[in-house]
């Protein structure tokens, strides 16, 4: 019956893709986020103000402790010719980034004064500190008359929503805002002409057209607000002056600690900005770029490296080195193993091996082990001591999963991805000491765990046990399945572990891991390639089984990347998962709103696969689309695009599933895949499931056949699909 499968593949390849009008790249995102790996903050271009300041990059320290939002808003104002305005009332002339740095830059104007503002978190400190610098330039023809710069910061140190029971005092040249949450420091540079705080509300004073009045103590009150004023009257035409405010937070109320953090960042506005720029220049000096990037691609590429840097925790402690899935205020500021793996792969490719090693060291030192045994039915989850979280981590480096009515997510795909990261890191650096230091975690508690997860018999014999995998389908009631993605990552990881074993002289282990990878490859091909020569989502899904995550089979060498299975599956996804916007695809055919968005990581993985299949004409438009969209949206890459409009959706910016996927796609365009990126033609394929038999199938056709007769025959001969298995991942996060 194999000829029926070949005929179906032939018909799929020959059928034209659905005609779709393509949405043009356009702007749809307005928030500029930044971090220093400790504090995070964001500026909303539409609202023309800082709208977020958080004490941590991560969402939760532990199950009981959420990261707090410390800001309502903050912004500058100007007085020109005796006329006051808060800059929230002036449209920006431009907004974006200060060259490649993680420094937001916004330009606005009032009268003859132009304000160039810079917002950033200094990497010179590991304290939660955010800096706002304003450079005021007189663009008029005469000296500035009756002119000033204002600043207001509405932060939250109290109880409840943070506004209850605050007290602001002028102490040692700065405002201290204290409450139940701790100390918020408002440190002006240089000393202001005036410093006001509630009840002398600076917002109302400026709106009334006057100047600020000096305040010393607000008393305990709700929603207290401080502000500053600097006089710039007499500023000559063409001249500029800079002013700055450093915002810092200490939960223990330690002013001395915050003073030290401010001093490390800089003691003048010029020093604050120059040190931050110098730090970012030093970072980019350690990076490398793939050859042949266009100017737009280089801009987007560099921004992704900045995002990856800012997504990594720099706080001391067990969480140090973890990489968030997104920057806050996006809600995926959580360290998923899978997302971190894609981010780490990109760091290694870009030459940022110090950051990559910090991420790997985090994995090796994290606290895990909550999901050895047993589930509600008495069966194992992992079934053995393991080294990596089954899903993600809290900010303190402890394991976290998420549960709903179908139980927890328990995912095995991260194990293989992490092993591949380690092997790639060692290939790039020669750091075999990392392998010997963490040999137990890498070999016994990860690679051997994968080998132990292989099903011994039954319909799934030879496959990795059912799990929740990439789309987080949960554990019970049909959620866990033998997903193609997990099989592919496990093959990748076992081959990578064989390389690691070879490097430290463990030849017998290397042979054992290679044999396990080969056996798993054969089993996966036998079980997960349909008679129609397509890779299906899982063993359990016998119909409606399109899942773009199965691209791992192509990217990691379970099937020849340019064989009939690869090309037929790519074409099936291209047609069956097309989005109305006319560019990429959605992630699977489950039908939920989240599923049916366009997934940027999927687009980039498909670009890799199409290129490896010899179809650069399919790969290049995907990269070009994401690049063009990013260029119009501050070079940031989101989790999703709206399936109809192409607008940004989901969390922005994404690290592993955004920045990491884009960086790797550009590297794979110009450099061959790594040691485990492909197999010889037909490797691991059995006669009934995988490789082309050379008998004149679709990939050997010499001409361009008429498509529709073949399609009609194929439809007539293929049996009616059985009713699909209901998936359980409709409303869960993509992983």
Regions found by a protein language model. Give the residues of each.
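Low-complexity, Ser/Thr/Pro/Gly-enriched N-terminal "stalk/linker" regions
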Residues: 22-37, 201-204, 210-211, 253-255, ...
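C-terminal capping/lid segments that line or modulate ligand- or cofactor-binding pockets
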Residues: 23-73, 343, 379, 386-414, ...
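An extended acidic
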Residues: 23-110, 176-206, 231-233, 273-294, ...
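Polysaccharide-binding surfaces and accessory modules of carbohydrate-active proteins
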Residues: 23-25, 105-107, 113-212, 226-228, ...
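Short Pro-Gly-centered flexible turn/kink motifs
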Residues: 95, 143-147, 233-254
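Helix-terminus loop motifs that line ligand-binding clefts
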Residues: 96-107, 315-326, 334-335, 348-429, ...
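Extended ligand-binding clefts on enzyme/binding-domain cores
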Residues: 185-199, 300, 371-400, 409, ...
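A cross-kingdom C-terminal cell-surface attachment/processing module
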Residues: 706-723
